């Protein structure tokens, strides 16, 4: 027994030593020796998703002569988070997402919903411009009109009524309709009301100008257009293995072809890491002090999906419910109309899954590989402070097929198991951030990382993500290139995004003009709140000077 305890103690000590060595290992890339006369490109985009495609499009329109490289580890672009089946495609506008509004001290706070709605208006302007320029094809190939509905029952009816009363005071939500009449809700979303208990108290709001967006289609179309530019080069099946700074303050991005095993590098003045969940790991390679404050917490999602025409024909809406008390924002249930590659589907979910992977096509070692001496304590602290989230994830992972079907029946009472299949969605990596002098926090939104000189940038986090990608990348341009966005790029940015630098939540006239323009261009449903405008032909509004 003593011998066993001795060996056990030695084993524990060895494990502790190995753990300490692992945590204190160097994680930054080694500097690559490059030739003085080696060519330097203007920008490297890591990841072939919606963010890189959008930023690359901005660059080619603002600086047509820039040399740009894009690296994607899979054999095609738009196969991870941007893929149609890997995201909810909701066109987040703040219309139906009740987690964007909360009641504080008896007052309904709608600022976050206004923020998201304003950002999506920027996205629609960006896509409209690309349609006008022939960069994006027929709008229905990537966006379709789908009303956005918030639906509740029981005690949540009062919450929705208060939410509606507050939201219609904002120009961004003019035109929103509210009802407690089951017959009206059945007209809006037949599946939701079919065979529902007639004694159950229900309520819903509806925004006609809502949409469903296929971000995979947008990504592919943008990248296809970028490929027509001789100054742009896409390399697929290529994994970025290092990002290091050179003595002249440029950066070297090292990469490996996953099919041939060949390694190489490229020097660049600017790096954007738009690699979805893998952005945290790649950012650590830079060795930047600012990057040490980040860690990641991966969460996956599953959806029940049907393409049965008898069901999909009855549902043309995105219906969002309200998360259970104490549940995290990612748990908001919704039953959505989706148009993917020309076919109509209905999805319900999400059901959270757990995996150590940072990407759907990643490795189970991703979480471990991102752990180091700088973030291990913040990760532990956040885990202990968010036991409700841990409990929620455990309950979700333990769900049976019958449990998931019962959840679906809360939104589609007549649902039958044989009509639905379970589909694994994408991975999202929530940010764990430890700023100096502040406690570590778990964040549920997106965050732009920019080095002090703006040469290295990254997008971290999850929702609303793809829905507001044109706004997010515009914000990134402002952080990384402040002089250009205020100077020589300013006029072009106003041409691409007419409302650039304008607050649409405070300018109902401009908002109306913008929505008429984008809705007519993208084929969306919109009725102007101004009677006088209803008789006018929608045209692109004149950009305001900065």
From Swiss-Prot:
Q: Which reaction does it catalyse?
A: (S)-malate + a quinone = a quinol + oxaloacetate
The enzyme's E.C. designation: 1.1.5.4
- Which biological pathway? Carbohydrate metabolism; tricarboxylic acid cycle; oxaloacetate from (S)-malate (quinone route): step 1/1
Give the highest taxon in the source lineage.
Bacteria
Q: Provide a GO biological process annotation.
A: tricarboxylic acid cycle
Q: Which cofactor does it need?
A: FAD
Provide a Gene Ontology MF annotation, just one: 2-hydroxyglutarate dehydrogenase activity
Look up keyword Chaperone and say if it applies: no
- Kindly state which keywords UniProt assigns to this record, in alphabetical order: FAD, Flavoprotein, Oxidoreductase, Tricarboxylic acid cycle
Q: Which InterPro entries match?
A: FAD/NAD-bd_sf (IPR036188), MQO (IPR006231)
- Family, per the entry? Belongs to the MQO family.
Q: What is this protein called?
A: Probable malate:quinone oxidoreductase
Q: What is the lineage of its organism?
A: Bacteria, Pseudomonadati, Pseudomonadota, Gammaproteobacteria, Moraxellales
Per the record, the gene is mqo
């Amino acid at each position: 027994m003593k011998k066993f305890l001795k060996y056990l103690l030695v084993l524990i000590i060895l494990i502790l030593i190995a753990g300490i060595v692992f945590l204190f290992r160097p994680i930054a890339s080694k500097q690559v020796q490059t030739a003085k006369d080696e060519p330097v490109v203007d920008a490297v985009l890591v990841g072939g998703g919606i963010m890189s495609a959008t930023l690359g499009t901005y660059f080619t329109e603002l600086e047509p002569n820039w040399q740009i490289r894009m690296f994607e580890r899979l054999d095609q672009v738009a196969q991870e988070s941007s893929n149609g089946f890997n995201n909810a495609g909701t066109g987040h506008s703040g219309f139906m997402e009740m987690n964007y509004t909360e009641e504080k001290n008896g007052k309904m706070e709608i600022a976050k919903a206004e923020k998201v709605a304003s950002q999506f208006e920027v996205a629609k302007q960006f896509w409209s411009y690309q349609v006008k320029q022939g960069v994006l094809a027929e709008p229905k190939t990537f966006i379709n009109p789908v009303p956005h509905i918030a639906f509740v029952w029981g005690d949540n009816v009062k919450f929705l009524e208060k939410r509606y009363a507050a939201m219609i005071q904002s120009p961004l939500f003019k035109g929103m309709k509210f009802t407690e009449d089951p017959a009206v809700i059945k007209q809006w979303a037949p599946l939701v009301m079919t065979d529902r208990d007639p004694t159950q108290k229900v309520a819903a709001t509806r925004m006609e100008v809502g949409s469903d967006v296929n971000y995979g289609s947008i990504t592919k179309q943008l990248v296809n257009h970028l490929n027509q530019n001789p100054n742009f080069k896409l390399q697929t099946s290529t994994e970025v293995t290092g990002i290091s700074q050179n003595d002249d303050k440029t950066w070297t991005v090292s990469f490996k072809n996953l099919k041939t095993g060949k390694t190489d590098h490229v020097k660049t003045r600017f790096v954007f890491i738009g690699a979805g969940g893998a952005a945290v790991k790649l950012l650590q390679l830079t060795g930047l002090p600012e990057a040490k404050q980040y860690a990641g917490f991966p969460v996956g999602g599953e959806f029940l999906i049907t393409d049965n025409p008898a069901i999909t024909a009855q549902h043309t809406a995105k219906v969002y419910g309200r998360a259970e008390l104490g549940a995290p924002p990612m748990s908001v249930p919704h039953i959505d109309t989706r148009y993917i590659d020309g076919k109509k589907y209905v999805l319900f979910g999400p059901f959270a899954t757990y995996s150590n992977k940072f990407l759907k096509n990643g490795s189970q070692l991703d979480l471990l590989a991102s752990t180091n001496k700088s973030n291990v304590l913040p990760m532990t602290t956040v885990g202990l402070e968010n036991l409700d989230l841990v409990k929620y994830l455990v309950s979700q992972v333990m769900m049976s097929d019958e449990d998931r079907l019962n959840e679906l029946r809360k939104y589609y009472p007549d649902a039958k198991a044989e009509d639905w299949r379970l589909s694994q969605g994408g991975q999202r990596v929530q940010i764990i951030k430890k700023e100096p002098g502040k406690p570590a926090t778990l964040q549920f939104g997106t965050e732009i990382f920019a080095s002090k000189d703006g040469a290295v940038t990254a997008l971290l986090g999850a929702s609303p993500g793809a829905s507001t990608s044109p706004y997010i990348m515009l914000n990134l341009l402002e952080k990384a290139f402040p002089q250009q966005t205020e100077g020589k790029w300013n006029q072009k940015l106003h041409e691409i995004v007419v409302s650039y630098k304008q607050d649409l939540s405070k300018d109902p006239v401009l908002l109306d003009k913008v929505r008429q323009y984008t809705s007519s261009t993208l084929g969306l449903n919109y009725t102007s709140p101004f009677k006088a405008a209803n008789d006018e032909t929608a045209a692109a509004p004149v950009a305001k000077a900065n």
